[in-house]
């Protein structure tokens, strides 16, 4: 399913971001819009509802409106960066149910630092992936989250 275009009507746009009740929602929080769009398209083909960053909304606004089950979070973006987004997730207990996938083109040491950053704040990353990522790794996290959700474990 293509990502709805940004319209001049804020209310229409907000409705488009609201999740469908039965589908697993994946937010691709990455400033590489081509990469994010390609990944969103692949996830949609697999039956997931995926959203990316769109002009006119901050990552936090999209995150709050879309209420994702899984967030694929790039560490290095213009503010708010991945670390600020992780802090936002930690501060909001309602978001503790989600599966967090940390992604970066940085080296393995940076990814390990991000994983420790999460753990120190009481959240566990479901996966830590170095770019270029593989769709199979993302699908594994999404499917595991879907199973937990269907089993009522969250």
Predicted regions and their residues:
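Active-site residues of response regulator receiver
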Residues: 74
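His-Asp phosphorelay/catalytic-motif detector in bacterial-type signaling
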Residues: 67-69, 93-101, 124
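Alpha4 helix (beta4-alpha4-beta5 surface) of REC/receiver domains from two-component response regulators
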Residues: 84, 97, 106-128, 140
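Conserved acidic segment of CheY-like receiver
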Residues: 20-34, 39-43
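The feature encodes the CheY-like receiver
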Residues: 36, 78-79
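Acidic, metal-coordinating helix/loop segments flanking the phosphotransfer/catalytic sites
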Residues: 52-70
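Acidic catalytic/metal-coordinating carboxylates
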Residues: 55-58, 81-87
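Non-catalytic signal-transmission and effector/linker regions of two-component phosphorelay proteins
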Residues: 1-27, 124, 134-154
């Amino acid at each position: 399913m293509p990502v709805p275009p940004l319209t001049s009507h804020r209310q229409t746009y907000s409705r488009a971001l609201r999740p469908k009740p039965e589908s697993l929602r994946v937010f691709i929080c990455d400033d590489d819009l081509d990469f994010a769009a390609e990944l969103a398209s692949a996830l949609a083909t697999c039956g997931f509802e995926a959203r990316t960053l769109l002009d006119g909304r901050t990552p936090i606004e999209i995150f709050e409106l879309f209420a994702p089950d899984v967030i694929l979070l790039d560490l290095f973006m213009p503010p708010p960066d991945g670390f600020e987004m992780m802090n936002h997730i930690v501060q909001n207990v309602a978001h503790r149910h989600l599966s967090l996938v940390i992604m970066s083109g940085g080296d393995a040491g940076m990814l390990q630092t991000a994983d420790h950053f999460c753990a120190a704040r009481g959240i566990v990353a479901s996966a830590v992936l170095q770019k270029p990522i593989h769709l199979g790794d993302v699908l594994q996290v999404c499917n595991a989250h879907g199973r937990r959700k269907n089993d009522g474990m969250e």
